[in-house]
């Protein structure tokens, strides 16, 4: 698409917004940026990248978008914003950065693998990227995982080197403003309550996820998730994965845990560096996606052995006095914490809490009753989690800080136990982000170890 001399307003000055502004300016667009409350750091970075670019600061209204032909909206900005909705009603075009990428690469020969879901998508995206590289493909991993897609696209255009495959992690927010993406293989890994502060209900949220299947590519679907099972689209090839039954990609539980492909045991899970049964599901999905674009199984299995996993995703921090300390700070919703607990084989002292984003915490109860010794609660929604678990028979304690909770968990844990930070909540009520929350946990674990030495 030709952006030369088009009046484009980039809405939201986060990482994807900054990348969009740079990309569009490089293609000759007349760029304006609008943000209700931009940080000084982002404004300074924008000025360094695009000196003199017009910036509209403050609540959006009709004047904010006056004269614009196209709005490029960042994922954190709801399309239901009254000024954006009015722009659309008046015939204005509103897209996101994924849509700009989709239009740019259409027909260029690159493969696209698209990954969404409530939980596990960052792990699966990273794993798929690793497996594609292991199979010899020039691979770009981008999207919701951290690298803005338009930053990656601009770099590739400037180098003149088209990748073999784009591996994209996509949030529901990104998919809302995406229309042309035609992935060669795509998955919705699972659906659990998340972002209900932005969606009417769980079905509304799930519907946004289904946009990943626009086009005619291979659908890789979770047979164990009822909402995902309902996403089959006529005319699409489908590959199923399951931990609990027969599927194209399944788990054998006799004689240890083995990954099965088309009924044949092909990989001993003991050879993976990832912990927990939920990561077996992630591996099955990744194999389905990679085989969906025609990659050979043998090279994929070799790649599985060398994937180390992601920071802050069920990551072992340390082990001393027979107690393992595991960081799952990226577990920001109930489904993620459920998965972490269900993947544990040792008794757990759980640290949870933060900003619950309107979730129902009831599903935590059976998972905690199965494996937890105690639950320590922090943050804004500690009381709501406590109410959901109050008749569970578990020891429940509230703590004012994560440092206090970590020290208390270490005191309650017995040799052979796991202290698990898996908050089931966002972090912004107490921390800069989930990585900051993780670092506080890691530092406190180190202090506990030093005090016991």
UniProtKB/Swiss-Prot annotation:
- Biological process GO annotation list? cell division; cell wall organization; peptidoglycan biosynthetic process; regulation of cell shape
Which pathway does it serve? Cell wall biogenesis; peptidoglycan biosynthesis
Q: Mind telling me which residue stretches traverse the membrane in this protein?
A: none
Among the Pfam families in the record, one is MurD-like_N
Q: Keywords in UniProt for this one? A: ATP-binding, Cell cycle, Cell division, Cell shape, Cell wall biogenesis/degradation, Cytoplasm, Ligase, Nucleotide-binding, Peptidoglycan synthesis
- Catalyzed reactions per annotation: UDP-N-acetyl-alpha-D-muramoyl-L-alanine + D-glutamate + ATP = UDP-N-acetyl-alpha-D-muramoyl-L-alanyl-D-glutamate + ADP + phosphate + H(+)
Location comes to: Cytoplasm
Q: Which InterPro entries match?
A: Mur-like_cat_sf (IPR036565), Mur_ligase_C (IPR004101), Mur_ligase_C_dom_sf (IPR036615), Mur_ligase_cen (IPR013221), MurD (IPR005762)
Q: Which SUPFAM superfamilies match?
A: MurCD N-terminal domain, MurD-like peptide ligases, catalytic domain, MurD-like peptide ligases, peptide-binding domain
| Record has Nucleotidyltransferase as a keyword | no
GO molecular function (one) = ATP binding
UniProt binding sites for ATP: 117-123
Q: What is its EC number?
A: 6.3.2.9
What highest taxon heads this organism's lineage?
Answer: Bacteria
**Has keyword tRNA processing?**
no
A Gene Ontology cellular component where this protein is annotated is: cytoplasm
Question: Which family, according to UniProt?
Answer: Belongs to the MurCDEF family.
Biological role: Cell wall formation. Catalyzes the addition of glutamate to the nucleotide precursor UDP-N-acetylmuramoyl-L-alanine (UMA).
This chain belongs to which protein, by name? UDP-N-acetylmuramoylalanine--D-glutamate ligase
Look up and give the organism this protein is from: Chromobacterium violaceum (strain ATCC 12472 / DSM 30191 / JCM 1249 / CCUG 213 / NBRC 12614 / NCIMB 9131 / NCTC 9757 / MK)
């Amino acid at each position: 698409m030709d952006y030369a001399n088009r009046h484009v307003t980039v809405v939201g000055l986060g990482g994807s917004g900054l990348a969009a502004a740079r990309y569009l300016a490089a293609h000759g667009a007349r760029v304006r940026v609008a943000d209700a409350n931009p940080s000084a750091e982002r404004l300074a970075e924008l000025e360094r990248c695009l000196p003199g670019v017009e910036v509209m600061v403050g609540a959006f209204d009709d004047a904010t978008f006056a004269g614009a032909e196209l709005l490029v909206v960042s994922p954190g900005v709801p399309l239901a914003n009254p000024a954006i909705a009015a722009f659309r009603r008046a015939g204005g075009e509103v897209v996101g950065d994924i849509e700009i990428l989709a239009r740019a690469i259409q027909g260029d020969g690159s493969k696209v693998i698209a990954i969404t879901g409530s939980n596990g998508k960052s792990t699966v995206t990273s794993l798929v990227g690793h497996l594609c590289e292991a199979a010899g493909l020039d691979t770009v991993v981008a999207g919701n995982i951290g690298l803005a897609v338009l930053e990656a696209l601009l770099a590739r255009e400037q180098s003149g080197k088209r990748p073999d495959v784009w591996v994209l992690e996509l949030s529901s927010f990104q998919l809302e403003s995406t229309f042309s993406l035609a992935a060669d293989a795509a998955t919705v890994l699972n659906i659990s309550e998340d972002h209900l502060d932005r969606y009417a209900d769980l079905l509304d949220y799930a519907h946004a996820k289904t946009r990943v299947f626009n086009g005619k590519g291979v659908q890789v679907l979770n047979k164990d998730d009822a909402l995902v099972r309902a996403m089959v689209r006529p005319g699409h090839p489908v590959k199923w994965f399951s931990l609990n039954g027969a599927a194209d990609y399944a788990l054998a539980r006799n004689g240890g845990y083995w990954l099965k492909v088309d009924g044949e045991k092909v990989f001993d899970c003991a050879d993976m560096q990832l912990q927990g049964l939920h990561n077996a599901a992630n591996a099955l999905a990744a194999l389905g996606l990679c085989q969906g674009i025609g990659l050979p199984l043998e090279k994929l299995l070799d790649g599985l052995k060398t994937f180390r996993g992601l920071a802050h995703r069920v990551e072992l921090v340390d082990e001393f006095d027979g107690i393992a300390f595991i960081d799952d700070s990226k577990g920001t919703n109930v489904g993620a914490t459920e998965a972490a607990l269900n993947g544990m084989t040792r008794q757990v002292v759980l640290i949870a809490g933060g900003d619950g984003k309107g979730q129902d915490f009831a599903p935590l109860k059976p998972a905690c009753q199965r494996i937890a010794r105690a639950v320590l609660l922090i943050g804004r929604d500690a009381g709501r989690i406590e109410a959901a678990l109050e008749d569970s028979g578990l020891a429940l304690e509230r703590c004012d800080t994560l440092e206090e909770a970590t020290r208390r968990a270490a005191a309650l844990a017995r040799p052979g136990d796991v202290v698990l930070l898996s908050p089931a909540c966002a972090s912004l009520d107490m921390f800069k982000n989930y990585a900051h929350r993780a670092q506080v946990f890691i530092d406190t674990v180190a202090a506990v170890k030093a005090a016991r030495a």
